[in-house]
Regions:
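Intrinsic-disorder/low-complexity, polar/charged segments enriched in Ser/Thr/Lys/Arg/Asp/Glu/Gln
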Residues: 1-5, 61
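Compact, glycine-rich, soluble single-domain proteins
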Residues: 7-58, 72
Length: 94
């Protein structure tokens, strides 16, 4: 199983727009991905409600896990996304 630990970089944490971008990217991954904070139970990374329920604020460490072909690359991309301040970036459709 592939695992990545990453610190949430967005100023608002995993809330609203950053969470939506992350959930969309996780849903496009070639393997199922889970996300958790601390010792909490892992939740599906492609579920907006589950991701929001984590209450991950800026600076929170989250753990991403996936298994299967393409898991390493998928987690690399998702970890890079979470580490950025998505609040400071312009929306792609702007």
């Amino acid at each position: 199983m592939a695992t990545r630990t990453v610190t949430v970089g967005s100023a608002s944490g995993l809330h609203a727009r950053p969470a939506a971008l992350f959930v969309a990217a996780a849903g496009a991954a070639p393997v199922p991905v889970t996300i958790r904070t601390g010792q909490k139970r892992a939740v599906p990374a492609n579920s907006m409600l589950s991701v929001l329920s984590l209450g991950a604020k800026q600076g929170t460490e989250v753990v991403l896990e996936a298994d299967g072909e393409g898991a390493e690359a998928a987690l690399d991309g998702l970890a890079e996304l979470l580490a950025r301040d998505l609040d400071a970036e312009e929306p792609a459709d702007a």
